[in-house]
Amino acid sequence: PAFHRAYDLIAGADMPIETLLFGNPSQMSRAGRSAFYGRAWLFVHMLNSTPEYKEQLKRFLEMVGRGIEQRKAAVEAFGDLGELEKALDRYLKSSLSYRKGSTPLVYRSDIAITALDEVGSRLVELSLARLMGNDLPATRDALAGLAAKAPGNAAVQLELALAERDIAADSNPSDFGPAEQALDRAIAADGNLGRAHAFKALMMMYRLNDQGVDDPAEWKQVRDHIAIANRQDTEDPLPLLAYYESFLYEGRAVPDIAHEALAKAFSLVPEDKTTRVQYAFDLAKQQQYDKAIRLIEFLANDPHDAEQGKRLVAQLEAMRDGVPYLDTPALPVESEEEESAAP
């Protein structure tokens, strides 16, 4: 259990309610952020403790979502903020309640449990090391050694390909050749490994785009790999996103079916920032500005990185209003959805 949160609650006891509602954690000290986290948790806990508070919270979020200034929305939803702060102080000293849910969490039921051999066990260890990203060259070399030991293991080749990709992404210029070669070996070992086909399509996209290739036959091969990946798992967001992006990289107009693929991908991983941003800007390009802005306003209230969300909202508003926006924010370069969902 995170016992240190009890200290955070005490340390944050003198944090004003205005700081919880309107403060920017990214501008706080480490101790300040920790205190903010604990007191903000308590605040949310209190706002979910009674039907009246729940209704106030709902009203506040709805008004902020409509673009009403946060302080005005807070006063209209909660009333006197001084009284709200006193209520929070009293709540801290009370016995906190919890609610036992009778409905289980939603999860995929098609779970397969497999006993791992020596190679599989080592692969899990190296996969986690790659995700940590502390020493990618050393992890890549260890994966190459494992691949030499088990040359016919498609999963090992796929993980080696991802390590090569991660290293290439951090290099200038980027050379995804070694990653693509490892993906070829993975596909040769197991032609039904959907993720290998999906990442192969992505590597091909990068290469063809860099080389300025517009040969329809080459881009058909890209989408052939995507189709194979999609057939293996129609609920995997990665092939859906790759299909959408293939038209962007080729420089072609995005067809309706690709817009639909991106929408489905987002519905599968709404928690992923990169996918959310991609989908929001695709909606904006279709002049669905209000929906696009609502999607990004979610990020503008992210306690860990609200500034990027605010810049993205400003960019979308500029697109809607037909005015230039020069401070174009960089999209996240990489996120966990590359491993579980998206390209």
Predicted regions and their residues:
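Acidic/His/Gly-enriched intrinsically disordered linker/tail segments
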Residues: P1-I113
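Beta/coil-rich, acidic/histidine-enriched accessory regions frequently appended to metallopeptidases
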Residues: R66-N209, G309-P343
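Structural signature of tandem alpha-helical TPR/SEL1-like repeats
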Residues: N134-D141, A169-A182, D210-H225, G251-K264, ...
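Canonical positions in the second alpha-helix
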Residues: G145-L146, R185-A186, I228-A229, K264-A265, ...
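Structural marker of alpha-solenoid helical repeat scaffolds
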Residues: K149, A189, Q232, S267-L268, ...
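Residue-level recognition of tetratricopeptide repeat
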Residues: N153, L193, D236, D272, ...
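Alpha-helical adaptor scaffolds
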Residues: L162-D166, F199-D210, D215, W219, ...
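Alpha-helical protein-protein interaction scaffolds
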Residues: A280-F281
